[in-house]
């Protein structure tokens, strides 16, 4: 039974004593903190660096077309993977301070995955080099805060140059190049993503699922994606991806704020009886109701997630109507006097699949609602042709794009579970890189872009003349810029320093192709990176590097050493 009373978990409140009230003895809760291990200054940074190096070493071997795989053993499963963020998140070191360093670098991978969906390995390599060079400078007397400021200013200017030199994606070949590179030079994946994007257009959505066969196929279905994520991370069902994933979910669509859990009880009990999840799309939900839903979700009584209404003002109502139509739900509008208290399960919509991240929600429509969707699209196209209002035209066009773009479901197959999981990760990276490239364009790949950005460092340093330590920050970033190309070359069995030197002599578009072993125009050769991924890698790397370089002490829990066993003497019993 769904529990609506929060009393079992509501915090205890303390009321002031009234006049004449008997003074009860105060009760205190004693919290015993574990013993801490403390390291200061250089020692703390060296320990953190050791953990960072161990994680970065494990991840960097996967970079580039000649990168290696990593075997990941977890409980009863063995995975062979080439995905930076998966490797990074799986690493836990026995030394607590080293593990703290590794955990900080894991944040780079997680941020990259959330912001760009790819480039985690590059970001980790950049961060490691910034931290290593920065720690050395600080050990020799450089001011940590000034060094950090210099690094931040340098990266800010490099990002501006990067965006200025970015080239818009032009056609299927560019998409194929980006997707192939991101998938570890897998041309099958590159072709798959390019053909899929061609079917659904730049506004479409790609969903990735496991196939029941060894074949990989693409099905285009009706669906929609909007920019609102889950209201609580406690709704997450896929911990690895930090996503909520529902199959055959029921959907409640309303523009009202939910302030009482009693409004939801009949719907929650019905979906629980049917063993189907419930997605609630609402204007807002009170903290108390959200807490009740989370507690019941944790106890396994319900399977639910809540997202806020997408859109702004008038556009919000139209989007909710489109979602209701697409899912076959009744749009429970407060303006029309429709109360949530009297809502029934018949007013809920249906979906084939729902995927919710921290920032977005994707709904794949059930086949039963397809005729209604097509009819709505036809009506909106008629409205678009008849309106002279430029603002309305834009909004109607956006709604049409959301409904017509559809959702391409890539059903990934493999002969073994290991092959299937590896291919899914590669396709996921390729998908994310492709949409990033379509948003902000492409730059030369293979680490060449970062090497060519070295030409900007002298100019940037001139603007940092007031503070010599800030100039050191610029030099630290310059040292880090060569690291991705060095790692790619090393994995290909080539001297990285030679690759860096020769690439610096070439023009912007050119660099070393680790697949062919040639120095050439990388964009013509199909070696391209999304500008969005390249800039986020720099920004996320310098962010965590700045935190670590300005760290002066580390406190971690002491590991309790087991007491030595008492040796047993023959003939004398032990107590």
Curated annotation (Swiss-Prot):
Keyword Transit peptide: yes or no? yes
Q: Where is this region: Disordered?
A: 1-27
The residues forming the transit peptide are 1-32
Q: Name one GO cellular component term.
A: chloroplast
* GO MF annotation list: ATP binding; ATP-dependent protein folding chaperone
Where does it localize?
Answer: Plastid, Chloroplast
Which InterPro entries does the entry link to?
Answer: Cpn60/GroEL, Cpn60/GroEL/TCP-1, GroEL-like_apical_dom_sf, GROEL-like_equatorial_sf, TCP-1-like_intermed_sf
User: Is-annotated flag, keyword Zinc?
Assistant: no
Name the keywords, alphabetized.
ATP-binding, Chaperone, Chloroplast, Nucleotide-binding, Plastid, Transit peptide
Q: A biological process (GO) annotation for this entry? A: protein refolding
TM spans (from-to):
none
User: Locations of Low complexity compositional bias?
Assistant: 1-18
Instruction: Please indicate which superkingdom the organism of origin belongs to.
Output: Eukaryota
Gene3D superfamilies for the chain: GroEL, GroEL-like equatorial domain, TCP-1-like chaperonin intermediate domain
Oligomer status and interactors: Part of the Cpn60 complex composed of 7 alpha and 7 beta subunits.
Provide the family line: Belongs to the chaperonin (HSP60) family.
The entry's function note states: Involved in protein assisted folding.
Name assigned to this protein: Chaperonin 60 subunit alpha 2, chloroplastic
Please report the organism this UniProt entry assigns to the protein. Answer: Arabidopsis thaliana (Mouse-ear cress)
Gene responsible for this protein:
CPN60A2
């Amino acid at each position: 039974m769904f529990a609506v009373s929060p009393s079992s978990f509501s915090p205890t409140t303390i009321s002031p004593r009234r006049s004449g009230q008997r003074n009860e003895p105060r009760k205190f809760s004693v919290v015993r903190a574990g013993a801490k291990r403390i390291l200061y200054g250089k020692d703390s940074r060296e320990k953190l660096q050791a953990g960072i190096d161990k994680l970065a070493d494990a991840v960097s071997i996967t970079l580039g077309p000649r990168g290696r795989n990593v075997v990941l053993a977890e409980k009863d499963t063995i995975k062979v993977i080439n995905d930076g963020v998966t490797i990074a998140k799986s690493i836990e070191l026995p030394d607590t301070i080293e593990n703290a360093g590794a955990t900080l670098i894991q944040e780079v991978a997680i941020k990259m995955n959330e912001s760009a969906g790819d480039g985690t390995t590059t970001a980790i390599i950049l961060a490691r080099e910034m931290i290593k060079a920065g720690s050395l400078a600080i050990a020799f007397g450089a001011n940590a805060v000034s060094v950090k400021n210099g690094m931040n200013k340098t990266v800010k200017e490099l990002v501006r140059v990067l965006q200025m030199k970015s080239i818009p994606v032009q056609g299927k070949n560019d998409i194929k190049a980006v997707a192939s590179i991101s998938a570890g030079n897998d041309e099958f994946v590159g072709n798959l993503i390019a053909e899929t994007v061609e079917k659904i257009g730049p506004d479409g959505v790609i969903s990735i699922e496991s196939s029941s066969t060894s074949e990989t196929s693409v099905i285009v279905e009706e669906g929609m994606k909007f920019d609102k994520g889950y209201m609580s991370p406690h709704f997450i069902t896929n911990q690895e991806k930090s996503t909520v994933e529902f199959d055959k979910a029921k959907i409640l669509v309303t523009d009202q704020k939910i302030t009482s859990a009693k409004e939801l009880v009949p719907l929650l009990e019905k979906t629980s009886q049917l063993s189907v999840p419930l997605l609630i799309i609402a204007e807002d939900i009170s903290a108390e109701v959200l807490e009740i839903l989370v507690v019941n979700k944790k106890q396994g009584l319900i399977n639910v997630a809540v997202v806020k209404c997408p859109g702004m003002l008038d556009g919000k109502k139209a989007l909710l109507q489109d979602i209701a139509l697409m899912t076959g739900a009744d749009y429970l509008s407060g303006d029309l006097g429709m109360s949530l208290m009297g809502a029934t399960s018949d007013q809920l919509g249906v979906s084939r699949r729902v995927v919710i991240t921290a920032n977005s929600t994707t709904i794949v429509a059930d086949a039963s609602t397809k005729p209604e969707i097509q009819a709505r699209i036809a009506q909106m196209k008629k409205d678009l042709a008849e309106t002279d209002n430029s603002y309305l035209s834009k909004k109607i066009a956006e709604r049409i794009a959301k409904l017509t773009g559809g959702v391409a479901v890539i059903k990934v197959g493999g002969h073994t579970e290991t092959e299937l999981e590896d291919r899914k990760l590669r396709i996921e990276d390729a998908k994310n890189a492709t949409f990033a490239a379509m948003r902000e364009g492409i730059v030369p790949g293979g680490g060449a872009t970062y090497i060519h950005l070295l030409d900007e460092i002298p100019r940037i340093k001139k603007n940092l003349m007031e503070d010599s330590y800030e100039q050191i920050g610029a030099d630290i970033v310059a040292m880090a810029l060569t690291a991705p190309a060095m790692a790619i070359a090393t994995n290909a069995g080539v001297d990285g320093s030679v690759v860096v030197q020769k690439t610096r002599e070439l023009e912007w578009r050119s660099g070393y192709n680790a697949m062919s072993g040639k120095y050439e125009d990388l964009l013509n050769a199909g070696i391209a990176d999304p500008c969005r991924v390249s800039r986020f890698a720099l920004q996320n790397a310098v962010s965590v590097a700045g935190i670590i370089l300005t760290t002066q002490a580390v406190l971690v829990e002491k590991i309790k050493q087991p007491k030595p066993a008492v040796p047993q003497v023959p003939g004398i019993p032990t107590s």
